[in-house]
Amino acid sequence: MATSGANGPGSATASASNPRKFSEKIALQKQRQAEETAAFEEVMMDIGSTRLQAQKLRLAYTRSSHYGGSLPNVNQIGCGLAEFQSPLHSPLDSSRSTRHHGLVERVQRDARRMVSPLRRYPRHIDSSPYSPAYLSPPPESGWRRMMPWGNLPAEKGQLFRLPSALNRTSSDSALHTSVMNPNPQDTYPGPTPPSVLPSRRGGGFLDGEMDAKVPAIEENVVDDKHLLKPWDAKKLSSSSSRPRSCEVPGINIFPSPDQPANVPVLPPAMNTGGSLPDLTNLHFPPPLPTPLDPEETVYPSLSGGNSTTNLTHTMTHLGISGGLGLGPSYDVPGLHSPLSHPSLQSSLSNPNLQASLSSPQPQLQGSHSHPSLPASSLAHHALPTTSLGHPSLSAPALSSSSSSSSTSSPVLSAPPYPASTPGASPRHRRVPLSPLSLPAGPADARRSQQQLPKQFSPTMSPTLSSITQGVPLDTSKLPTDQRLPPYPYSPPSLVIPTHPPTPKSLQQLPSQACLVQPSGGQPPGRQPHYGALYPPGSSGHGQQPYHRPINDFSLGNLEQFNMESPSTSLVLDPPAFSEGPGFLGSEGSMSGPQDPHVLNHQNLTHCSRHGSGPNIILTGDSSPGFSKEIAAALAGVPGFEVSASGLELGLGLEDELRMEPLGLEGLTMLSDPCALLPDPAVEDSFRSDRLQ
């Protein structure tokens, strides 16, 4: 026990007297305390940094809702505004929020934050009609707050005298302001009238949507009534005032719906602020020209493929008579155009066309018995009488050009009455526009034969191309299996208006028309009576009244055309010329006053009852000075020459057209729908939709 008692206090004094253990404990204690202090400081540093990061993140979130282009969270922006508000902003924010329909409150920051060089400034604000609060970055309060948005007369004088250096540091459009605006005192003059060329000062851009000089901030504070936003066409009437100092000229929005389409609509400098331009008001011209007839959009352009309906109606719109009944699938190779016949020139110069019809040509009488002869003798005479610059005919002769190759084409053009008749009204002088190719010799005929298959679109046959060229085709040299078969159905009706020579009936009957409807299958045997195919002034029939040819038609005198084979003769359908109400009326009503619209309407309804092909309706109305317009329009087309000498037919025009062989460049211009219609007056005179 003594040893244990002695051992006990001895061990206690030994442990208490050992200073190394105490110092170790103290060192351990201090080390723990230092570690805890370091850990605490680290935690406190983390807390501080997370507070700063949270504040930065919240700032970045409110900014990114504007910069990212996405829709901002309205509630969060409204809540986050409280710490950034200054007393100067508070009376302005209500009017600013109502300006944007209460959807978005713009984030406000005081001027110290705005001097940061890393700040992205707004490029383009309030210039798009897509409610640009969603699409553009927010404007900055450093300059924005200096402008009164409502009627704040107490602050206006105070804010007006703030230094402009503080204002200009806020937006980069202030750079444009300081460069472009030497005079900050003139106020914005309001929307200027539209001017075509963008001017830097008073003219405005293309429709005066902004004045490009971007005036200083102080001038915007002068009067709220001058702060209309003319570049926003939808909000212009609401007279909400906008500043223009933040605007960079970039987007041109055309508020006027009748802005001319040829004004360049591309903005001069594209916007980089995220706002989209309004493309609904921009007038882009359509890639194809508008159809000549708004109702008949089925026949849009001249390159109609292998649809004869397209080509017929387009030629009708262009003032070209469509002698077009040839089916598009017939591709006849080796076609010849026998225009080198010497009687063509004699019939051009001979006013007595009946004599030239009967005297030098045996093909007319016996073309069915002479299959080796050129069977386009009818085209020899229909071409000189109707299509060679005849001013009183609205149907230039493409009509009988396909008579040698197709029995379905209407081969009778209307009887010509030249406008040199005494008292002929100049209102009805129509210079034909047919794309005629009239070669005078065999070399020209061969050249036109080589050119014809290439000149129209590849889907058209050469026969179709030569029909539209007005070149009569000779299929008599082809083998008989390559000739075109007779058509069992009724071919296209053709309404060709001609004009009577007397001025009374010129005024009364401007749109009288003869309806020619050939039909196949009747036996040949009678030579056509050409009492209607001479011009006045020729042998003894010069001044006959106009109803005589119509009477000849209705009596069936022009009953039949002899073609190269007996089974394919063209016959005029006598019911088409009956004197009933289905036609234009009786002989007495021919010379009586009739409404041209009623006549044309009767022509329409009468044509629509005959045949399965297209109707060719050529009205006779023309504006005064029409032939001069056409001559001026055709002056630039190669292959057409305006000659003062005329065609030796005694036409009383000073501007006749002499048709030259049409080259490839002329035909490409011809197939362009805009080439022959350079101006709306000429185009309007071609329209056939004025039938009502």
From Swiss-Prot:
Q: In UniProt terms, what is the effect of altering K628R?
A: Translocates to the nucleus and no COP1-mediated degradation
Would the keyword Cell cycle turn up in this protein's UniProt record?
no
Q: Which InterPro entries match?
A: TORC, TORC_C, TORC_M, TORC_N
Q: Where is this region: Required for interaction with COP1?
A: 209-215
N-acetylalanine modification sites are A2
Where on the chain is Phosphotyrosine found, per UniProt? Answer: Y489
Annotated localization: Cytoplasm; Nucleus
The UniProt site entry described as Required for ubiquitination and degradation is assigned to K628
- Positions carrying Asymmetric dimethylarginine are R51, R99, R120, R123, R161, R168
Key word Membrane present: no
Q: What is the effect of changing S171A?
A: Up-regulates CREB transcription factor activity. Reduces interaction with 14-3-3 proteins
Q: Which residue intervals are annotated with compositional bias (Low complexity) in the record?
A: 336-384, 391-412
Give the free-text PTM comment from the record: Phosphorylation/dephosphorylation states of Ser-171 are required for regulating transduction of CREB activity. CRTCs/TORCs are inactive when phosphorylated, and active when dephosphorylated at this site. This primary site of phosphorylation, is regulated by cAMP and calcium levels and is dependent on the phosphorylation of SIKs (SIK1 and SIK2) by LKB1. Following adenylyl cyclase activation, dephosphorylated at Ser-171 by PPP3CA/calcineurin A resulting in CRTC2 dissociation from 14-3-3 proteins and PPP3CA. Asymmetric dimethylation of arginine resisues by PRMT6 enhances the association of CRTC2 with CREB on the promoters of gluconeogenic genes.
What does UniProt give as GO cellular component?
Answer: cytoplasm; nucleoplasm; nucleus
Summarizing the function annotation, the protein's role is:
Transcriptional coactivator for CREB1 which activates transcription through both consensus and variant cAMP response element (CRE) sites. Acts as a coactivator, in the SIK/TORC signaling pathway, being active when dephosphorylated. Acts independently of CREB1 'Ser-133' phosphorylation. Enhances the interaction of CREB1 with TAF4. Regulates gluconeogenesis as a component of the LKB1/AMPK/TORC2 signaling pathway. Regulates the expression of specific genes such as the steroidogenic gene, StAR. Potent coactivator of PPARGC1A and inducer of mitochondrial biogenesis in muscle cells.
Q: How does it assemble?
A: Binds, as a tetramer, through its N-terminal region, with the bZIP domain of CREB1. 'Arg-314' in the bZIP domain of CREB1 is essential for this interaction. Interaction, via its C-terminal, with TAF4, enhances recruitment of TAF4 to CREB1. Interacts with SIK2. Interacts with 14-3-3 proteins, YWHAB and YWHAG. Interacts (probably when phosphorylated at Ser-171) with YWHAE. Interacts with calmodulin-dependent catalytic subunit PPP3CA/calcineurin A. Interaction with COP1 mediates nuclear export and degradation of CRTC2.
Family indicated by similarity: Belongs to the TORC family.
Protein name in the entry = CREB-regulated transcription coactivator 2
Annotated source species: Mus musculus (Mouse)
Mind giving the lineage of the organism this protein is from? Eukaryota, Metazoa, Chordata, Craniata, Vertebrata
What is the gene name? Crtc2
